[in-house]
Amino acid sequence: MNIGLFFGSFNPFHVGHKIIASYIRDFTKVQQVWFVVSPQSPMKTKKSLLDQHHRLMIIKMEIEDNVNLDVSDIEFGLPTPNYTIDTLLYLSEKYPNHNFSLIMGDDNLNNITRWKNYEKMLENYLIYVYPRKNVDMNIKHKNIHIVKDVPKIEISSSLIRRLISEKKDASY
């Protein structure tokens, strides 16, 4: 099975994540999308991070009606910090009958050269990139596929956190 891995802190998870995952599933070779909840990204601070189990449960509740979406806590049991390449290698070994690919936004693609063993990722895994804000993508590779026409949702986890801190409506 072709599994698209959508890594993130999902702090919090929102409808934009579901829309992107469903679109990638419907318009690429990905047959199922797994949201991989990262306990702590090596690229982010932990100061405002909700508990990892809480984030996992939120996603489980939000996707329970969609058999093409799943959530994984695989990184909870792996050594920290969690590096994407380590998780990919672990999953590839654990599930040899699956083909794994990555799902990421253009902002992450533009920073991929800062990731641990990014060259190995580029050589061994397809990467589906959803454009977010018309960012010029400065990296090209045969395994990078820009997914055109992904609905652009002007919502982000950081916006939701800001609205909550300002005691404004963040119900979307």
Per-segment meaning from a language model:
Residues 1-172:
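Nucleotidyltransferase catalytic core that binds NTPs
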